[in-house]
Every structure is written in structure tokens, then in C-alpha cells.
From Swiss-Prot:
This is Structural maintenance of chromosomes protein 6A. Keywords: ATP-binding, Chromosome, Coiled coil, DNA damage, DNA recombination, DNA repair, Nucleotide-binding, Nucleus. The flexible hinge domain, which separates the large intramolecular coiled coil regions, allows the heterotypic interaction with the corresponding domain of SMC6, forming a V-shaped heterodimer. Its main location: nucleus. GO terms for biological process: double-strand break repair via homologous recombination; response to X-ray; sister chromatid cohesion. Belongs to the SMC family. SMC6 subfamily. Disruption phenotype: Delayed root growth in seedlings. GO terms for molecular function: ATP binding. Residues 23-1049 form the Zinc-hook domain. It comes from Arabidopsis thaliana. Forms a heterodimer with SMC5. The SMC5-SMC6 complex is composed of the SMC5 and SMC6 heterodimer attached via their hinge domain and from the non-SMC subunit NSE4A or NSE4B. One of its GO terms (cellular component) is nucleus. Expressed in seedlings, rosette leaves and floral buds.
Length: 1058
């Protein structure tokens, strides 16, 4: 029993907490004993306590009044004006409800809060519904009733609001029928039962009345049915007689019209056949024009390819010549730059020497005046020392310059090496990307071989063909590459694929209609430029005579190909001449086969390494290999994927190695630049020291000269002469320097021009190489197009000769025979009746003469049988039928409509009645489970027996301290506390079976002792918190033992005034 009770407690509907429909606050003005009372309620459990007479019960009464209850329904007054406080003229009940969540009542109108305001005066009572802003929305009773039904707030249901009168009534009642009435009303079963019984009674009465009314028209309906049967039969006999006459005339002319139909069909056939002649001839002429145009274009393209090959060879030689000239010009420019810098350095040294001589002249003049014997002696010593230091400094400067030049050359070489390594890295990365792309393509082809011959577009095309397969006379074959394999492994795969090219992507159809259908499928699959070949699928495998094949020991493409489809091999022979394409091992062998042996019936030679060679008259052509791509005709792509993965891994290793070399070169370059900066700094410092010491030495020399009493004027003159000599040398060197600078500019200009010419020529050569490859592809396409056009032209010529013209001749012969037959049939039919009578009968429906003959015989037999049965006049029968039908027609229509409506109502009542019976049984079981579950909290067990037939509800309670183990069947035999607790358990069991956003209980703990009240309160609170509705408990007793909880709100009413 407890298991079922726990199961009910954990019902997710009961556990769902919703804020919609709960009371936020109530305000009473001049209502019963309250002048102005306002109470705010919590969303969960609310306790209202106070002394007797404090107006606790008036709150429940006010709620009942606000929700539309009549005064007598509250059991507190006879009329609503009795609720007005003595001495006042009106009473006001103001209730504020939450209106939030999914169950909100018209939230777009009322908002989050809904207000019910009922004002009662001596003469009137008005209920107003307001929105969350206090604006009046409605004052209609229907709106309030809709609100109450929406939230299921039935204040007369004791499970929603149990007043103190109802509590005492149940406690004092020992009658099982009264308990049943309480249960039946609380679960709303009473209301549903009464409504269904009332409807059932009314339906039975209506059915009985309708049956009586329908019986009154039964005799007349029987007479009408008999008349209708007679009229119908008589009309049918007349129709049959007239039909026989018309059929005989039609039969006579049907022979004529049948021949006319045959003549028309034959004439349409002749016209259709003749329409084919210009169409077919136009196709032949158009294909013939295409063939001639393609032949001219093919000859021009071959000449263009040969010219492009010669031009590309000459371009390569010119490129190499320009590259050598560019290198030579660069070397000359570098040599001139070095010479220019060297001469600039010499001129600067001479200028420095001149400046020193000028300072020396000035110093001599000064020294002459102030020199002494002692100073001259010291100057000589210093002069010797400075001479040694200058020589040493000059030696160090020279060695540092040489070392700096060496480091600079190494740094320049290191920079060029770094650029070369970066270029290598870019080349390897590009190769690796291409290899990875090829690997991905091969893996895709390995999963589905068809994708190798058109990619995803061919898959979409095949699906479109499957969807529209009914449009094709024969299913298309393709792509061709998916239907062929190589016999000797993958050895010749690259050469065969180079020879067949885009032909491997082509599809084959049997006629022009299938070609149009396949093009439509291609457009749907977004497969543009789809190559389609028309070929007769019924044609057997072509038998090629041996003398028509090149006589060589080397294989042809046809000999290395295999296909299960004969049509595919025939197309390869007719379109691509695979029996005339010879395969060779390498360039040398291919050259011997193509140009030296002069084999008959040889068209092209293809080598494994990619060369194509052919001879057309005296012109010998060799096309270079194209960039290698993964072959698509391999039996297995594993080897290619493995080889490409090894090459990609090798390229990755090369990239890593080059990156290591780059890092090493960068480190070396940084070291050289650091060394160069250090050497330059040391050299600059030494040059400064050298200049300073040379000046000091010159000063000392001047001092020595004055000591030897040399003529200062003579020394100064000599120095002036030396300065003039140096200045003249400077002028000569600067003149030479200007000439050298002009030569340097010319060399630089020449180097730049050569470089630009090389780059332009390289770009031009690149374009010509690409143009050569493009021209080769176009040449192959032109050859394929020419062969395809010739095949289609021959196909249309065969159709014209073997099909179109013979069909026209045969159809004309048949037409002449039918014209003679028509003349004979027309002559015979005119004897029976003129053709105008047949036309007057209406349009010809087209039956054959045999069909008409059989129809006439069958109708004659039936007409004979019908004439034997009836002798009345059909007009009299129709008059009698019209009179009787008019008499009862309106009644019958009315009765039928009523019967249909009653049936719909009866079905609905039966469905609801069955559902009510099922719900009764479920509610009875659940009541017992819940009751026993709640009793168990006090150690009591019990049982409830409900009899819907006897309309009784009996309660059995078994006390744990009862040694007799007997159950108490009358609650009046229990103590006051036990009776109140059992009543509470019964009420909670009913509460758990009903829905309502608010519930209230007044003086539920009457007659309870302290222990029973404690258990009852705990039970009530646990139930209320789990159940999820808003609860209001009103009691005059102390509730201090109620545990504190955030969801429990306690309020104390003020004591009544004495």
C-alpha cells in the first residue's frame, strides 16, 4: 500500500511548481467583522491563527464570494448583503492573483497579475476583473466563470476550500452514504455523472420521438419505391429501342469511318516519315560541314604546334645567351665599383696629405720664433718614437682593411647562399603540396573508381540517369574509363591514358533521342561539356583484319585493353583508332617505330615516358611529355599512393634539411656581420690614432729643421711646391674618377637592361611553353571531335538509306489500298441511310464494327425480355410518383438530419461514460492507497471501501495498540484526536487526486490532542510542500511546533474587540 502511495507522491504533475493562479494578497473592506483587512500570502504554505471571533473564517468566506460563490453556498449568510458590516453601506473584496507561466489566463490582456474585485451593496453586487495595472478589463460573469474553470478553483469543492462547517459535518458523520457523497463531490464524479445521465435521458427521449415520427411515412415510402422501380424499367425499355435503331445506322457507317481512321493514321505516318527526310538531311549536311571545318582547323593546329616547338627551342637558346651576358655585365659592374672606391680613397689620402703640409707650414713659422736648443733635442727623441708608432699603426690599419674585405666577401656569399636555400624550400614545398593533392585524388578514386573519370559530377550524373531511366531507349554506357582495364598490369597505364585522354570520360548512347535525354541529365547534375558518342549497341564486336593493323612486335593500345562490354571496345576502335596506336618503351624505340620503319596503318606512337610521335606525309612531329599525373586505369592505386607518399616524405625530409641549412646560414651570416662591425670599429679608431700621430711627427720634423738652422723660408717654399704638386695630382685623379663614374653608370645601365631583357624573355618563354601545351591539348581535342563528327555523319547517312526512305515508300502503298476500300464501304452505307443522319445523332464515339454488332445482338435479347413484363403508361406512373414524393420529401430530409445529429451526440456520451467508469475504478484504488499511506505516519493502518452501486464509502481503521487486532469501521468509535487525524488522512488522499492552484482548510485540527496535532501538522506541511499548490491553514490553536521553513508563512490575526 505504501509503495502505491509513494508512487503517487512522486507524480511529476504534482511535483510541478507553477506560480499561475496563486493568491498574492486579499483586502477586505466592511466585510463581515473586518473594516479594513489586508493579508499577503506566500506561494506555498500559509498559517492563519487567532482567537475565536478574530475573523479567520471570514477570509475563506471572502475568497468564496470573490470567485463567484452564492451566499447560501458559503453557509454563512442567506444573501450577499448580509456580509456587509453592520453600519456600513457597502462591502469590498479585493483579490490579487499571480498570472505567470505556461498556464497563465490570457496573459496578453491581464499581464503578470490579475485582480478580482467584488463590491457588494444593499441592492447590487458587481464583480470586476482588472489587469496588472489596475485597469478594468471585464465585468461579465462569463469572464469570471471562464477564469474559475481555467484554474479549476471550485470553491464549493471541499478539496479546494474546506470550511469549518464542512470539517465538523464530516467528523460527526458516521453514515457511509454521507462519506460517499463527500468523496463523490470532492472528486467531481458527482458533477460528471449527473451531466451524463441528464444528457442520456434527453437523447433517449429524442430518439423515441424521432422513431414515432419516422414510422408515419413508412407506407408512403414503400409505394414510392415500387413506382420508381416501374418507371425506371419503362424508361430503360424506351431507351433500348431507340438505341438499337441508332446502332444499326452507326454500324453501316462504322465500316466507312473505320477506313477513314486508318487513312488518317496512315497519312499522319507518311507526313511524319517525310518530315524526317529534311531533318535527317540537315543533320547530315551539318555534320559534313563540321567535318570539313574540323579538318581545316586540325591542319592549322598541327602547323601551329610544329611552329611552337621550333619557337620554344630557339627561345631556350636565346635565354641561355642572355643569362651569360647578364652574368658578364654584373662582373664588369662589380670590378668598376671596386676601382671607383679605390681611386676615391687615394684622392682622399692626397687631400689629407695636403692639409697636413699646410698645417706644417704654419707650424714651421711658429717654431722658428720660439724653438730652443733643449726643445729641439726633445723633439728629435719624440720624432723617432712617433715614426715607429706610425709605421706600426699603418701596418695594423692595412691588415684590418684586408680582413674586413674578406669578411665582407664571405657575408655577401652567405646572403646569396641563404636566398638559394629559401628558393629550394619553396620548390620542395610546392612539390609536396602537389603530391598530397594527387594522393587525395587517388584515395578518392580507390574508394569509387568511377570518380576517377569526372569526379563528383559523374556520380551526380549517374544518379540523374537512374532517376530518369524511363526516358532512355537503352541505358547509357559510361564513363568509358570505368568499363576498361589493362591486361598486363600497370606497365602501359600512362601511355594509354595519354593516348585516350578525355575519351575515358565520355558516355555512349544508342540514338539521338537518348543523347538529348543524357544532356538534360547532365544539366541537372551540373556536368557541363559532357562528351557523348552515338553508337549502335546491337553491333557485334568488330573483327579487324590482320593486314589493317601495324605489323610490329610492339603492342597496340587495343591489345593491352580489356572490357566486358563489346560496345565500349567498338567505340574505342571507331572513335580513337586504338588498333593503330603503337606503344613503345622509350623515346629511342618510339622514334625508330614512328620515323624509320615506315609502317603502314600506323597512326601514332606513345612512349612510357610521355612522348607522342606521328608522321603525316613528309612532316615528322614529336610532342614532348606533359607533366606526369597519376594514372586512372590502374587495377589498384595502392602502389601509386605508396610511391607518392614515399616521395612526399622524401620532400618533407628535404624541406627539414634545407630549413636546418637555412638556420645555419643565418647564424653564420649574423656572426660575419658582427665580426665586420667589430673590425670596422677597430679600423676607424686606428685611423684616427694614425692621423693624430702623423700630425705630431710632422710637427716634430719641423722643429728639427729649425734646429739645423735651415732657412725657414726655404723649407716653406719646398712645402708649397709639394702642395702644388699634390693638388695637380688630385685634379688629374678626379678627372679620371669622373670618367670611371661614367663607365660605372654605363655598366650598371647595361646590367639592368640585360636583366630586364632576360626577365621579359623568360616570361615570354613561359607563355609560349604554356601555349604549346595548350595547343597540344587542343590538337588532341580537334582529332577527337573530327572522328566523332565523321561517326555521327555516317550514322545519319545509314538511317536515311536503310530506314527513312523505305518506310515512306511502304506507307504510300498502304494508303492507296485503303482509299479503294473506302470507296466500296461508302457505297454500301449510303444504301442504308444518308451520312447526314449519322452526323445529326452527334459526334462519332469511335467503336469498331465488330463492337457495334455484338452490342446490337445483346440489346435485342434484353429488349425482348423487358417488353414481356410491363403494360402500364409511363406518364401515369410519373404523375403518381411526383405527388407522393412531394408529400413526404421535406419530412424525410428533416428526420434524417435529426438522426445524424442524435447519433453524434450518443457516440460522444458513450465515450465519456466509458471513460467515467474507468476513472471511477482508478480513483477508488488510489484513494485507498493514499489513505493508508498517510495513516502509516502515525503507525495506523486502514482501508477504504467504495461501492458505486450502493453509493457507500466505508472507512476501516486499525489501531496499533489494539490487542484484538480488530478494525474500527465507525469513526465515531475513535477518540477525538484519532477521528480528526483519520479525517485529515482521508482529506489528503482526496487532495492528491484533484488539481487546484490554491487550497484552504479551516479548523482542520479540531478535537486533536497535542500529539495528534503535531503529527497532523507535519503530515500536512510535507504534503503541501510536495504537492506544489498554495495552501491556507486556519486554526485557533498554537502552531509554535510547526517547523520553520522558507516556504512556510505564519500570520496572527488581531484579537477581537470586546
Amino acid at each position: 500500500m505504501d509503495e502505491h502511495g509513494d508512487h503517487r507522491q512522486s507524480n511529476p504533475f504534482n511535483d510541478q511548481q507553477t506560480s499561475s493562479g496563486k493568491i498574492l494578497r486579499i483586502r477586505l473592506e466592511n466585510f463581515m467583522c473586518h473594516s479594513n483587512l489586508e493579508i499577503e500570502f506566500g506561494d506555498w504554505v500559509n498559517f492563519i491563527t487567532g482567537q475565536n471571533g478574530s475573523g479567520k473564517s471570514a477570509i475563506l468566506t471572502a475568497l468564496c464570494v470573490a470567485f463567484g460563490c452564492r451566499a447560501r453556498g458559503t453557509q454563512r449568510a442567506a444573501t450577499l448583503k448580509d456580509f456587509i458590516k453592520t453600519g456600513c453601506s457597502y462591502a469590498l473584496v479585493y483579490v490579487e492573483l499571480k498570472n505567470q507561466g505556461e498556464d497563465a489566463f490570457k496573459p496578453e490582456i491581464y499581464g503578470d497579475t490579475l485582480i478580482i474585485e467584488r463590491r457588494i451593496s444593499d441592492s447590487t453586487s458587481l464583480t470586476v476583473l482588472k489587469d496588472h495595472q489596475g485597469r478594468k478589463i471585464s465585468s461579465r460573469k462569463e469572464e469570471l466563470r471562464e477564469l474559475v474553470e481555467h484554474y479549476n478553483i471550485d470553491v464549493e469543492n471541499p478539496c479546494v476550500i474546506m470550511s469549518q462547517d464542512k470539517s465538523r459535518e464530516f467528523l460527526h458523520s458516521g453514515n457511509d452514504k454521507d462519506k460517499f457523497k463527500f468523496f463523490y463531490k470532492a472528486t467531481l464524479l458527482q458533477q460528471v455523472d449527473d451531466i451524463l445521465q441528464s444528457i442520456g435521458t434527453k437523447l433517449n427521449s429524442a430518439n423515441a420521438l424521432l422513431d414515432e415520427m419516422e414510422k408515419t411515412i413508412k407506407p408512403i415510402e414503400k409505394e414510392i419505391n415500387e413506382l420508381l422501380e416501374k418507371i425506371k424499367n419503362m424508361e430503360h425499355v424506351e431507351e433500348i429501342t431507340q438505341q438499337v435503331l441508332h446502332l444499326k445506322k452507326k454500324l453501316a457507317w462504322s465500316w466507312v469511318y473505320d477506313v477513314d481512321r486508318q487513312l488518317k493514321e496512315q497519312n499522319e505516318k507518311i507526313v511524319k516519315f517525310k518530315e524526317r527526310v529534311p531533318t535527317c538531311q540537315n543533320k547530315i549536311d551539318r555534320k559534313l560541314g563540321e567535318v570539313e571545318s574540323l579538318r581545316v582547323s586540325l591542319t592549322e593546329k598541327k602547323a601551329q604546334v610544329a611552329c611552337l616547338i621550333d619557337e620554344s627551342t630557339a627561345m631556350k637558346r636565346e635565354l641561355e645567351c642572355l643569362r651569360q651576358s647578364m652574368k658578364k655585365a654584373a662582373r664588369e659592374k662589380i670590378a668598376l665599383e671596386e676601382e671607383y672606391h679605390h681611386k676615391c680613397s687615394n684622392i682622399q689620402k692626397i687631400k689629407d696629405r695636403v692639409r697636413r703640409l699646410e698645417r706644417q707650414i704654419e707650424d714651421i713659422n711658429e717654431m722658428t720664433i720660439r724653438s730652443t736648443q733643449v726643445e729641439q733635442s726633445e723633439i728629435e727623441g719624440k720624432l723617432n718614437q712617433l715614426t715607429v708608432e706610425v709605421e706600426k699603426a699603418e701596418s695594423l690599419v692595412s691588415s684590418l682593411k684586408e680582413e674586413e674585405n674578406m669578411v665582407m666577401e664571405k657575408a655577401s656569399a652567405g646572403g646569396k647562399e641563404k636566398e638559394h636555400i629559401e628558393e629550394m624550400i619553396r620548390d620542395h614545398e610546392k612539390k609536396q603540396r602537389n603530391m598530397n593533392a594527387h594522393i587525395n585524388d587517388l584515395k578518392k578514386h580507390q574508394t569509387n573508381k568511377v570518380t576517377a573519370f569526372g569526379g563528383d559530377k559523374v556520380i551526380n550524373l549517374l544518379r540523374a540517369i537512374e532517376r530518369h531511366h524511363r526516358r532512355f531507349k537503352m541505358p547509357p554506357i559510361g564513363p568509358i574509363g570505368a568499363h576498361v582495364t589493362l591486361i598486363n598490369g600497370n606497365r602501359w597505364a600512362s601511355a594509354v591514358e595519354q593516348a585516350l585522354g578525355n575519351l575515358l570520360n565520355a558516355f555512349i548512347v544508342t540514338d539521338h533521342k537518348d543523347l538529348v535525354a543524357l544532356r538534360d541529365c547532365g544539366k541537372e547534375a551540373k556536368y557541363n561539356n559532357l562528351k557523348i558518342i552515338i553508337y549502335d549497341f546491337s553491333r557485334p564486336r568488330l573483327d579487324i583484319p590482320r593486314h589493317m593493323i601495324p605489323q610490329t612486335e610492339h603492342p597496340t593500345i587495343l591489345s593491352v585493353l580489356h572490357s566486358e562490354n563489346t560496345t565500349v571496345l567498338n567505340v574505342l576502335v571507331d572513335v580513337s583508332c586504338v588498333e593503330r596506336h603503337v606503344l613503345a618503351e622509350n623515346y629511342e624505340v618510339g622514334k625508330i617505330i614512328a620515323f624509320e620503319r615506315r609502317l603502314s596503318h600506323l597512326k601514332d606512337v606513345f612512349t612510357i615516358d610521355g612522348y607522342r610521335m606521328f608522321s603525316r606525309g613528309p612532316v615528322q612531329t614529336t610532342l614532348p611529355p606533359r607533366p606526369r599525373r597519376p594514372t586512372r586505369l590502374c587495377a589498384s592505386f595502392d602502389d601509386q599512393i605508396k610511391d607518392l607518399e614515399i616521395e612526399a616524405s622524401r620532400e618533407q625530409s628535404e624541406i627539414q634539411e634545407c630549413r636546418g641549412q637555412k638556420r645555419e646560414a643565418e647564424m653564420n651570416l649574423e656572426g660575419l656581420e658582427s665580426t665586420m662591425r667589430r673590425l670596422k670599429k677597430q679600423r676607424t679608431q686606428l685611423e684616427k690614432d694614425l692621423t693624430r700621430k702623423e700630425l705630431e711627427m710632422q710637427d716634430l720634423k719641423n722643429s728639427v729643421a729649425s734646429e739645423t738652422k735651415a732657412s725657414p723660408t726655404s723649407s716653406v717654399n719646398e712645402l708649397h711646391l709639394e702642395i702644388m704638386k699634390f693638388q695637380k695630382e688630385i685634379e688629374e685623379k678626379e678627372s679620371l674618377l669622373e670618367k670611371l663614374q661614367d663607365s660605372l653608370k654605363e655598366a650598371e645601365l647595361k646590367a639592368n637592361e640585360l636583366k630586364a631583357s632576360y626577365e621579359n624573355l623568360y616570361e615570354s618563354a613561359k607563355g609560349e611553353i604554356e601555349a604549346l601545351e595548350k595547343a597540344e591539348d587542343e590538337l588532341k581535342e580537334k582529332e577527337d571531335e573530327l572522328h566523332s563528327a565523321e561517326t555521327e555523319k555516317n550514322h545519319y547517312e545509314d538511317i536515311m538509306k536503310d530506314k527513312v526512305l523505305p518506310e515512306i515508300k511502304q506507307a504510300e502503298t498502304i494508303y492507296k489500298e485503303l482509299e479503294m476500300k473506302r470507296q466500296e464501304s461508302n457505297k454500301k452505307a449510303s444504301i442504308i441511310c444518308p451520312e447526314s443522319e449519322i452526323k445529326a445523332l452527334g459526334p462519332w464515339d469511335g467503336p469498331t464494327p465488330l463492337q457495334l454488332s455484338a452490342q446490337i445482338n445483346k440489346i435485342n435479347h434484353r429488349l425482348k425480355r423487358e417488353n414481356e413484363n410491363y403494360s402500364e403508361s409511363i406518364d401515369d406512373l410519373r404523375i403518381m410518383h411526383g405527388e407522393k414524393e412531394q408529400k413526404i420529401g421535406k419530412k424525410r430530409k428533416t428526420y434524417k438530419s435529426c438522426r445524424e445529429k442524435l447519433k453524434v451526440c450518443k457516440d460522444a456520451v458513450d465515450s465519456r461514460w466509458n471513460k467515467l467508469q474507468r476513472n471511477k475504478d482508478l480513483l477508488k484504488r488510489e484513494l485507498t492507497w493514499q489513505f493508508n499511506h498517510h495513516l502509516g505516519k502515525k503507525g495506523i493502518s486502514g482501508n477504504i471501501r467504495v461501492s458505486y452501486e450502493d453509493k457507500t464509502l466505508s472507512i476501516e481503521v486499525k489501531m496499533p495498540q489494539d490487542a484484538t487486532n480488530s478494525a474500527v469501521r465507525d469513526t465515531r468509535g475513535l477518540s477525538g484526536g484519532e477521528r480528526s487525524f483519520s479525517t485529515l488522512c482521508f482529506t489528503l488522499a482526496l487532495q492528491n487526486m484533484t488539481e487546484a492552484p490554491i487550497r484552504a482548510m479551516d479548523e482542520f485540527d479540531v478535537f486533536m490532542d497535542a500529539v495528534s496535532r503535531k503529527i497532523s501538522l507535519d503530515t500536512l506541511i510535507d504534503f503541501a510542500l510536495k504537492q506544489g499548490s498554495q495552501w491556507m491553514f486556519i486554526t485557533p490553536h498554537d502552531i509554535s511546533m510547526v517547523k520553520s521553513h522558507e516556504k512556510i508563512k505564519k500570520q496572527q490575526m488581531a484579537a477581537p474587540r470586546s
